[in-house]
Amino acid sequence: MGRVRTKTVKRAARQIVEKYYGKLGLDFQYNKKVAEEVALIPSKRMRNKVAGFITHLMRRIQKGPVRGISLKLQEEERERRMDYIPEKSELEVPVIQVDQDTADMLNFLKISLPNLKVMSFNAHEHREDTK
């Protein structure tokens, strides 16, 4: 069974990963040396725990975004995804078909849509494409 990591170890490892992401890798020994260089860790045992959690976080980061860690690379990727504009809008449809009740509601609310077409639908009629 695994051991529970303390809040101190997790917090220290997250801060080191955020600041020195470019220097770190998936190798525990290398991460241990980097942690020793960049942080004042009081004991050897604590340094090893921090380095172990850094290695664990680096593996998780490679799989995808990790909660609680803000990396410049991930921020840029998120910004790029949010700023994406599709070539063809899904909202631009040639004709919007509505029944008479819906058309009356839109008129009451003073909403005018350019491609609106009022259709008469039978309540008992079942459309083929709704299956």
Curated annotation (Swiss-Prot):
Alphabetical keyword list: Ribonucleoprotein, Ribosomal protein
NCBIfam families: PRK01151.1
Single Gene Ontology BP annotation: translation
Name by which UniProt lists this protein: Small ribosomal subunit protein eS17
UniProt GO cellular component terms: cytosol; ribonucleoprotein complex; ribosome
Organism: Theileria annulata
GO molecular function: structural constituent of ribosome
Protein's gene: RPS17
Database matches in Pfam families: Ribosomal_S17e (PF00833)
Family listed: Belongs to the eukaryotic ribosomal protein eS17 family.
